[in-house]
Each structure stands twice: as C-alpha cells, then as structure tokens.
C-alpha cells in the first residue's frame, strides 16, 4: 500500500499511489527532503 507523503524510493515512482482525484501520485523532489509521493502536480 502506498500513501501520499510516503518516501519515493520505497515505492518507486509512486505510480501505485492513488490521489483523491483518481490519478497516480508523482514523486516530488522539489519540496522537502526526502523526496515523497505527492498529488500537488499539475
């Protein structure tokens, strides 16, 4: 199970993480360390 905010390296590219809108999460390497799975992408 992958959740938003999980560390990217644990879940690869975060494609298993589902956002509330149904899209897959992306790995956010720009906001905070370590890189984490995020839904804030546009």
Swiss-Prot record:
Domain of life: Eukaryota
Posttranslational modification: Contains four disulfide bonds.
Protein name: Perlinhibin-related protein
Upper lineage: Eukaryota, Metazoa, Spiralia, Lophotrochozoa, Mollusca
The entry's keywords: Disulfide bond
Functional note: Inhibitor of shell growth.
């Amino acid at each position: 199970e992958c959740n938003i905010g999980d560390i990217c390296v644990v879940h690869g590219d975060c494609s298993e993480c589902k956002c509330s809108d149904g899209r897959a999460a992306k790995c956010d390497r720009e906001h905070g360390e370590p890189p984490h799975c995020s839904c804030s992408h546009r």
